[in-house]
Design a protein with these regions (language model features):
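C-terminal region detector
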Residues: 210-225, 229-416
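Acidic, Ser/Thr/Pro-rich regulatory low-complexity segments at or just upstream of the first helical elements
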Residues: 1-109, 120-130, 144, 149, ...
Length: 416
């Protein structure tokens, strides 16, 4: 059964009611980073923290950079770095910095790790060589470590519903509506031309709203509809064109129908247009292309670098402590196992010794019983028991001869 958006982790865990809720989460992450840097062990004093607004500015710059990377790479190979990867990667980036501060994790590394992870999730071939060292002076292992921290911050909730897919579905529905109005002749040529022109314009508007907080406050299908309506309103002719998008939205979604089937009370047409207009008016908080903003970005970046370096030092020390503690636990387990093995070996040796003594006693008992039986048999037959007699030896060690034998030796004569 197809799961609705409202039942997804994206809706349950990564959608917020207002911009104030997002600001509160970012402020909490900022304060946690300041505390972490201030309470670090060691003699080195931490660099002064940057304001939260400056951290948000540097994040906005790298969100814009992420879209540039996708567009440049997609121009070389249209099958890679598609809009699906763009939206998924930017969603990862936004979610990460809801719970982390750019003072403790370099946004450039997170941007590249988001793209690399999004390629896996969206099943597009993006390899490390596409990202490093082309876009950052990072070792591949360092980027893989950032990817792991990214997944941990995302709580491994990696499936992202994209407005680009919803936009394609809406355009197909609009095309069917226009064709039905044309009757047997089908959609008129001007309507088809306008539909074709609406698609790239709507995509651009989706990309623009991605730079704002809209993906964290509105479902993707509503983002797609707002982009389509905004593109139609901004197109030449607007409502005077061959297609009336507002009339189609009113007919399609203004009644009992809803963008999300699980929505309990679909909004009225008036309320829906109000929501779509608010989404379309959401703009990025910072114009990172402006000259004055560029200068501010350079200053913020120079202040962030020592903070990130200090945070890495803290993290490295923490990892070393954890590794040392884990090694101590392993040594303790090895020693405990060694003691158990020695105790088991001692117990086995004791058992072997007991068995040996029992076998020796049993053998002695059998020999004693056999000797007694032989003596009794000899006595019954009138025989002397067998006795071993030891011969005497002379001083030279030779056996002493009997007297008759000695006399016989003396009487031997040798004749010439």
């Amino acid at each position: 059964m197809f799961a609705t958006f409202s039942s997804s982790s994206q809706s349950r865990c990564w959608m917020f009611d207002s911009a104030d809720a997002l600001t509160a989460k970012r402020q909490a992450a900022h304060e946690a980073a300041v505390t972490k840097l201030a309470n670090a062990e060691g003699d080195d004093a931490p660099p002064p923290p940057v304001p939260r607004e400056d951290g948000e500015l540097i994040c906005a710059f790298y969100e814009s950079k992420l879209q540039e990377v996708c567009k440049d790479e997609n121009a070389r190979d249209p099958k890679r770095f598609t809009n699906r990867v763009l939206y998924t990667a930017q969603s990862y980036f936004k979610r990460f910095y809801l719970n982390r501060s750019p003072m403790v994790e370099d946004p450039k590394g997170v941007m590249l790790a988001s793209l690399y992870l999004a390629g896996k999730v969206e099943e597009e071939r993006i390899v490390l060589a596409d990202l490093v060292p082309k876009y950052a002076k990072l070792q591949e292992q360092a980027l893989l470590a950032v990817e792991l921290r990214l997944m941990e911050a995302l709580r491994f909730q990696l499936v992202v519903r994209s407005p680009f897919r919803a936009l394609t579905g809406l355009l197909h529905d609009l095309h069917a509506h226009v064709s039905a109005e044309g009757g047997a002749a089908g959609a008129p040529a001007p309507a088809l031309a306008q539909l074709e022109a609406l698609h790239p314009r709507a995509i651009d508007r989706v990309c623009t709203c991605l730079k704002a907080d809209a993906p964290l406050m509105h479902p993707p299908q509503r983002l797609a509809l707002a982009a389509l309506l905004g593109a139609w309103d901004a197109s030449d002719g607007g409502g005077a064109g061959a297609i009336d998008v507002r009339a189609w939205i009113t007919r399609r979604f203004g009644g009992d129908a809803a963008l999300d089937p699980a929505e309990p009370e679909p909004p009225s047409a008036e309320k829906l247009f109000e929501q779509l207009g608010a989404i379309d008016q959401l703009a990025p908080a910072h114009d990172v292309g402006a000259a004055d903003v560029r200068e501010r970005l350079k200053a913020v970046d120079s202040r962030l670098k020592p903070l990130i370096k200090h945070a890495r030092k803290i993290e490295k020390a923490r990892e070393e402590r954890l590794a040392a503690a884990e090694e101590a636990k392993r040594d303790e387990r090895r020693q405990a196992k060694g003691g158990e093995r020695r105790a088991d070996a001692h117990k086995i040796l004791q058992q072997v010794e007991e068995l040996r003594q029992e076998a020796h006693a049993a053998a002695a008992a059998r020999l004693g019983a056999a000797g007694d039986t032989n003596a009794e048999n000899a006595a019954a037959a009138g025989e002397q028991p067998f006795v071993v007699r030891k011969r005497r030896r002379n001083d030279d060690g030779a056996a002493a001869a009997s007297e008759p034998a000695a006399a016989a030796v003396k009487s031997v004569k040798f004749e010439a």
